[in-house]
Amino acid sequence: MAPLATRPAPEAQDARRSSGVPVVEFDDVSKVYPGGHVGLEQVSMKIGRGEFVFLVGPTGCGKSTCIRLLMKELEATEGDILISGHSLPEMPRRKVPRLRRNIGVVFQDYKLLPNRTVYANVAYALEVIGENRQTIRRKVPDILRLVGLSTKLHNYPDELSGGEQQRVSIARAFVNHPPLLLCDEPTGNLDPETSIGIMQLIYRINRTGTTVVVATHDKEMVDKMRRRVIELREGRVIRDQQSGLYRPDESTSEFAVRLRGELGIGVEGHPN
């Protein structure tokens, strides 16, 4: 992969992220599933433009519930969820497709169409929002070059490795350059070496100005990327920390140290 783009100075990033309406806001949000299981309980958080945020915590803590609420796959039981100032509970059904055009989603299991080529899988994301053929022919090769798959346009998903399939998933999510990218366990099915490449790619997308929210169990990634960490437990936010670790009291491994070098990140979360 080509070197990561030069990152803005920290003070420029702070000004960019603190100005204007948050990209994501949860205001005292609770979600109770049928049967009484509590997915989230009185969760409040704000995520600014251009931030990179990890959602961490044990299985069932509420990470995926947050992602699904932001996609409007689920409805909150109580509270308000806003994306760029627009309330999701108050949003008419007819406006939901427009909302989803501005959100890219990367899943753990890729969710590729098995009977379509790499090119067609990515093009489909543009077809469903009504882009014309000329635009599709321009955008799809560009995004496949970005993710390192320019030679795989005509391959089918079953001809690709897991890492390559996830790159197709990322290309599909980002081909329309949405302001918000949601990633639900993006390295969950990948080995450590492949995971480095996937996180390099997501990090590179974030540095274009896209807000990135990653729900993950991947301790090594979280520890050495040192981005904002929001920890959930039993549906509640128990920690919200800038430049955080997966678990603040644990040391880092040799793999995590090498990962930090691969990503070009310095000691306090800034590029080397």
Task: List where the protein language model places each region.
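Short coil-to-helix segment of the ABC ATPase nucleotide-binding domain corresponding to the Q-loop/switch region
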Residues: 116-123
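Catalytic Walker B motif of ABC-type/P-loop ATPase nucleotide-binding domains
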Residues: 181-184
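Conserved ABC ATPase signature
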Residues: 156-160, 164
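ABC ATPase NBD coupling module
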Residues: 34, 88-104, 133, 205-207, ...
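Conserved ABC transporter NBD signature motif
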Residues: 79-87, 139
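Helix-to-loop junction immediately C-terminal to a conserved catalytic motif
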Residues: 71
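A short, proline-enriched helix->beta-strand linker immediately N-terminal to the Walker B motif
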Residues: 175-179
